[in-house]
């Protein structure tokens, strides 16, 4: 998953 996409969904994923 792309960090940018995760942030858009409201998820905080590093990497």
UniProtKB/Swiss-Prot annotation:
The keyword Ribonucleoprotein applies. GO terms for molecular function: rRNA binding. GO terms for cellular component: ribonucleoprotein complex; ribosome. One or more lysine residues are methylated. Belongs to the universal ribosomal protein uL11 family. Forms part of the ribosomal stalk which helps the ribosome interact with GTP-bound translation factors. Part of the ribosomal stalk of the 50S ribosomal subunit. Interacts with L10 and the large rRNA to form the base of the stalk. L10 forms an elongated spine to which L12 dimers bind in a sequential fashion forming a multimeric L10(L12)X complex. This is Large ribosomal subunit protein uL11. It comes from Kitasatospora aureofaciens (Streptomyces aureofaciens).
